[in-house]
Amino acid sequence: MPDIKAIQADARERMGKAIEALENNLSVLRTGRANPGILKKVMVEYYGSSMPIDQVASITTPDARTLVITPWDRGALNPIEKAIRDSDLGLNPNNKGDTIFISLPMLTEERRKDLVKNAKNYAEEARVAIRSIRKHALDEVKKVEGVGDDEIKRAEAEVQKITDEYIKRVEDTFHKKEQEILG
C-alpha cells in the first residue's frame, strides 16, 4: 500500500505529463512565425512505412516566415511535399529540386480565432486530465490505513495545492500561446 508522500509524488509526476502533452499539442499550432514544430505531426509515407517528417529531413527556419525542408535522401522529396500538402495545416510547399520551401502566409483574423479556440480546447483537455489525476490521488489517500483523520485532511489539502499549481501552469501556458497567436 503506497504512503501519502508516494501518492502525492505520483500525482505531481502525472500532472507534469499532462502539462507536457499540452505543450506538445500547442507546439503544432501555427502562430505566424516559422516554427519547425508545426510539422511535428506530419507523417511521410516513405519506403512503405509512415514516419514523422523530422526522421526523413532536416527542418530549418532561415527567417521568420519561411521553413526549409532538406531531405536526407532525394527520393523522399516528393513524399514529403505530398505529406505537407495533404496535412490540415493549410501550407503550400514549393519543391526546388533538392529542398522544399514553405512560405508562411499572414494569419487572417478568422484563422487566428480558430487557432485560439484549438489552443483553448487543448488547455481544457489538460485541465480535465489534471482534475482526474486529483480525484484518483484523493481516492488513494482515503484508502491509506493507519493514518489519522487530521493527516488525511492535510494530505487532501496538499493534493489540492498541487492541483492548483498545475492548473495555473495550464493557464499560463495557454495565455502565452494565445498571445503568440494573436501577435
From Swiss-Prot:
<dbReference type="InterPro" id="IPR002661">
    <property type="entry name" value="Ribosome_recyc_fac"/>
</dbReference>
<protein>
    <recommendedName>
        <fullName>Ribosome-recycling factor</fullName>
    </recommendedName>
</protein>
<dbReference type="GO" id="GO:0043023">
    <property type="term" value="F:ribosomal large subunit binding"/>
</dbReference>
<dbReference type="GO" id="GO:0006415">
    <property type="term" value="P:translational termination"/>
</dbReference>
<dbReference type="GO" id="GO:0005737">
    <property type="term" value="C:cytoplasm"/>
</dbReference>
<keyword id="KW-0648">Protein biosynthesis</keyword>
<comment type="similarity">
    <text>Belongs to the RRF family.</text>
</comment>
<dbReference type="InterPro" id="IPR036191">
    <property type="entry name" value="RRF_sf"/>
</dbReference>
<dbReference type="Pfam" id="PF01765">
    <property type="entry name" value="RRF"/>
</dbReference>
<keyword id="KW-0963">Cytoplasm</keyword>
<dbReference type="InterPro" id="IPR023584">
    <property type="entry name" value="Ribosome_recyc_fac_dom"/>
</dbReference>
<comment type="function">
    <text>Responsible for the release of ribosomes from messenger RNA at the termination of protein biosynthesis. May increase the efficiency of translation by recycling ribosomes from one round of translation to another.</text>
</comment>
